[in-house]
């Protein structure tokens, strides 16, 4: 019954949005409703529709950084990288101390082939942000290393991330690629043995060790 009620509410919200778009006078909604609509259209595989909702939301909530971040991700999913870069720069001016924004910019630049420029952003972030954010910064650096096919650097970058947090699942999932191409098998065995000593139930660490 609860699921049915939630589904009915969602359907009503979608119908209201469709009607308001057709009438060219979207209603003013609470932020949560916009997020629900965006998620719904994404799940349906309609990123253009999600983008339309984000644009309407930004007219009402022009200082909500979450909508800017969502718009950047949607534009990236549509391979509209120049537009994504423009929006991420707007977001940076609104919230320069949100680490997610420069990381998104670094990702866009990397996909466009400007890896060196992306690495400069990473170097700046390492000087500014605290250890709590360093894991995400290192994961993005590893993404850039992989794009540059510098798999040895990618290995050491992910190793650093795992030194900070041995249970970082993203780093554990990505590091095998760097091991395979850099041939850092001995160091990989040593690293994953240390991780397993700390957490004997780390499935990913056991998996990587088994392939080393």
Locate each region found by the language model:
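Start-of-helix register in tetratricopeptide repeats
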Residues: 32, 66, 100, 134-136, ...
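Canonical positions in the second alpha-helix
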Residues: 57, 90-91, 124-127, 160-161, ...
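Short coil turns that delineate tetratricopeptide repeat
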Residues: 62, 96, 130-132, 166, ...
């Amino acid at each position: 019954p609860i699921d049915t009620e939630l589904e009915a509410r969602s359907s009503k919200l979608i119908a209201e949005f469709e009607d308001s778009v057709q009438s060219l006078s979207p209603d003013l909604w609470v932020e949560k409703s916009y997020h629900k609509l965006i998620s719904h259209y994404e799940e349906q595989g309609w990123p253009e529709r999600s983008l339309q909702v984000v644009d309407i939301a930004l007219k009402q909530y022009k200082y909500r950084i979450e909508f800017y971040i969502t718009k950047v991700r949607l534009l990236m999913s549509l391979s509209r990288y120049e537009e994504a870069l423009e929006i991420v720069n707007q977001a940076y001016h609104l919230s320069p101390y949100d680490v997610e924004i420069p990381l998104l910019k670094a990702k866009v630049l990397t996909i466009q082939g400007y890896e060196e420029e992306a690495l400069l952003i990473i170097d700046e972030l390492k000087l500014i942000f605290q250890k709590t954010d360093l894991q995400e910064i290192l994961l993005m650096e590893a993404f850039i290393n992989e794009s540059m096919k510098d798999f040895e650097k990618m290995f050491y970058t992910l190793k650093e991330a795992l030194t900070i947090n041995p249970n970082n699942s993203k780093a554990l999932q990505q590091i095998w690629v760097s091991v395979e191409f850099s041939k850092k098998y001995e160091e990989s065995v040593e690293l994953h043995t240390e991780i397993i000593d700390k957490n004997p139930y780390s499935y990913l660490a056991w998996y990587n060790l088994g392939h080393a």
